[in-house]
């Protein structure tokens, strides 16, 4: 594949390295600071990257959202977290004319975790639920896009949910519909996500721990390889392999 990268931070640098190791070609990058000495051609617009087969985005909403308003038909893999509703709304529109893929976490293991939640939440009705995520000290957004994804899965399965982000502001006992959401930032933690079900005299945890950021880069590459074979449409890990 010939790949256009949107953003060239730590994640897309990994994508570039792994892509070239696997025989793919990086045709260029879209970055906000074009004066840096990048190893690839820089572009302002997606449509400028002639010859690209697919674009892979690991950037931020400030860079990505204006690009999604442009006129292009290049298959697009998006992994940006933050401003999820705005991004997915624009991707839904673009999917009417080209294939697009979105995931808040490019790890297939996280996708499996969401499927486990779909089984566990109905079976553990009445258990208190807490969501905890931990990342490195350079991650900006909190809670992580992945934790939001896990919360969204739970919200679809329960009649009423009340997210609680800051307990020190609540001077009352925990309510049955509360879902505690906690974010930890420190060191070089790649990414950890825990779903805690607390019942009477027992707890059950579902946990995913990323041991290398390569899992996200490889996940994006595998999604791109599938996406370029697909007709127009909106794809996620739920349907990309159909």
Curated annotation (Swiss-Prot):
Metabolic or biological pathway, per its Swiss-Prot or TrEMBL entry: Amino-acid biosynthesis; L-lysine biosynthesis via DAP pathway; (S)-tetrahydrodipicolinate from L-aspartate: step 4/4
Pfam family, one: DapB_N
Active site as annotated: 135, 139
Compartments reported by the entry: Cytoplasm
InterPro entries hit by this protein: DapB_C, DapB_N, DapB_N_CS, DHDPR_bac, NAD(P)-bd_dom_sf
Catalytic activity reported: (S)-2,3,4,5-tetrahydrodipicolinate + NAD(+) + H2O = (2S,4S)-4-hydroxy-2,3,4,5-tetrahydrodipicolinate + NADH + H(+); (S)-2,3,4,5-tetrahydrodipicolinate + NADP(+) + H2O = (2S,4S)-4-hydroxy-2,3,4,5-tetrahydrodipicolinate + NADPH + H(+)
Identification of the protein by name: 4-hydroxy-tetrahydrodipicolinate reductase
